[in-house]
Amino acid sequence: MKLNVCYLEMVEYEDALHLQERLHKLRVANELEDTLLLLQHPPVITIGRRGKWENILISKEKLLQMGVKVFEVTRGGDVTYHGPGQIVGYPIFDLGTVGKDIKRFVWLLEEVFINLLKDEYGIEAYRDEKQYTGVWVGGEKIVAIGIAVKKWITMHGFAFNVNTNLEHFSWIIPCGLKDRGVTSLEKLLGHKVEFDDVVYKVAKYFGKVFGAKFRFISKEDLEEIIKIKVEDSER
């Protein structure tokens, strides 16, 4: 299995969503290898398929004043927050590689971070298999997961709190869970972490867990791939 990894740095949510949709079409047509987008978003709130507006705790007017947009999206899950200091990942993967088993795919996503946190930082993280998706440390969520699958190709993905401003989660009831908190790598270690270093580690552990040979490609490389494939399809 080959895996393209593209770190896009800071990207507006709607731009990232549009990019996912373009890549999804190419992956469905088998004109693109499995691709993992890693990036950050400016502060934004998204509502998944099971989400409720009542889990956003501040008014639309206040959000507008703060410049925080809200998007209703097709991923699984409830309400979540994205913002600077958080690694957001969008795997555009063919589920045929995991036997078209969605639960297995989510399990593997969780495994990436459980292994990364233990091996690289000595943090004992775990999954809550009986109730909730995601990766947890001491009862608090450090990685949120919510995917969508169309034609057996994945979209959306995960949000890993690295140096995230956790106060922003007070704007919402994260994932609709009133009795659970959130944490970050910075909070657990007691200091900020070199962000780009963690980005590389995420890619490395994706390669390990999914048995993939990964390579980093630039934003320009990705745009060129899309351009060439689109031009070919129009001929």
UniProtKB/Swiss-Prot annotation:
This is Octanoyltransferase. PANTHER family: LIPOYLTRANSFERASE 2, MITOCHONDRIAL-RELATED, OCTANOYLTRANSFERASE. Pathway: Protein modification; protein lipoylation via endogenous pathway; protein N(6)-(lipoyl)lysine from octanoyl-[acyl-carrier-protein]: step 1/2. It is found in: Cytoplasm. NCBIfam families: lipB, PRK14345.1. In the reaction, the free carboxyl group of octanoic acid is attached via an amide linkage to the epsilon-amino group of a specific lysine residue of lipoyl domains of lipoate-dependent enzymes. GO terms for cellular component: cytoplasm. It comes from the Bacteria. Keywords: Acyltransferase, Cytoplasm, Transferase. Catalyzes the transfer of endogenously produced octanoic acid from octanoyl-acyl-carrier-protein onto the lipoyl domains of lipoate-dependent enzymes. Lipoyl-ACP can also act as a substrate although octanoyl-ACP is likely to be the physiological substrate. GO terms for molecular function: lipoyl(octanoyl) transferase activity. It catalyses: octanoyl-[ACP] + L-lysyl-[protein] = N(6)-octanoyl-L-lysyl-[protein] + holo-[ACP] + H(+). Its main location: cytoplasm. Pfam families: LplA-B_cat (PF21948).
